[in-house]
Amino acid sequence: MEQEAYRLISEANRRLKDVGFLFSWKFLRNVNNVKEVGNLLIRSAILFKAVKNWELAGYSFLKAAVLQSQESDFVLDTAINFVNASNMYRKIDPKKSIECLLQAIEVYKSINNFTTAAKHQMTVAEIYESCIMDLEKACMHYEYATEYYREEGSIKSANDCMIKVADCFTRMKQFDKAASVYEQIGIICMRLPILKHRIKDQFLKAILCHFCIGDKDMRLIVGYYTELYAQFIDYREYTLIMKVVESCDTCNLDILVDALREYGSVTRLDYILTIMLLEIKKNIQTQ
């Protein structure tokens, strides 16, 4: 199988070499030439993928995409093969994987397919977040995805991306920026019945971020959010917030610990909430 893959890629390279230059005008004027050589490269890529030769699979898909990008009849094929190349490189070279995805995104934007472009921006962000550990760039690409989904009117998907943005700010301990984004998400959710269940969670996180920043008049800030969303006082999240206020006012960590135990018995404390609460605990200890 791998031997056949090498034969196919050699044949593709020979045909490209015969015309003297990959992007020879004479060669590219013939759509069939692009199609035939592109097919050779794709077939070789599929075989390399089957034997888990990720580098040559990625190389072959990428070369096919670059070739097809020169002919307008192959716009979707170009984008698909940039994505295929990215998937192969992701296993061995995350940065190269991102480069391929960014090229695919540009193709999808050129044909006004912002939904697919947004989906791939999310993938770029996830690679930065989980493979390269660059939260700033992850945040930037989640923001791009948010913009693209909004462009297409996909409010729920845009909100999902905004949550990722806010979570990245929290992980970087940029609590002022996180608070602003969580608040925006909560306000957007208030306008959409399908997202109303998210309001309390986003306002909880926004308020906790204000605690993390060290804002002094927390009762005033809590009042601002209850004015925005009067039903907030009916939820367990509000009860937790008021216990945190009491704990901060009295510098009594036991109140915070008891409140978290009670809240956590019903609702799991996720990683993002844990970051915030540890920061609040540290602030109380240093008062």
UniProtKB/Swiss-Prot annotation:
GO biological process annotations for this chain's record?
protein transport; regulation of synaptic vesicle priming; SNARE complex disassembly
* Family, per entry: Belongs to the SNAP family.
Q: What is the lineage of its organism?
A: Viruses, Varidnaviria, Bamfordvirae, Nucleocytoviricota, Pokkesviricetes
Q: List, alphabetically, the InterPro entries matched.
A: NSF_attach (IPR000744), TPR-like_helical_dom_sf (IPR011990)
Record protein name field: Soluble NSF attachment protein homolog FPV033
SUPFAM superfamilies per record:
TPR-like
Q: Which GO terms describe its molecular function?
A: soluble NSF attachment protein activity; syntaxin binding
Superkingdom, taxonomy of origin: Viruses
What are the UniProt keywords, alphabetically? Protein transport, Transport
Name the gene for this chain. Answer: SNAP
Which species is this UniProt entry from?
Answer: Fowlpox virus (strain NVSL)
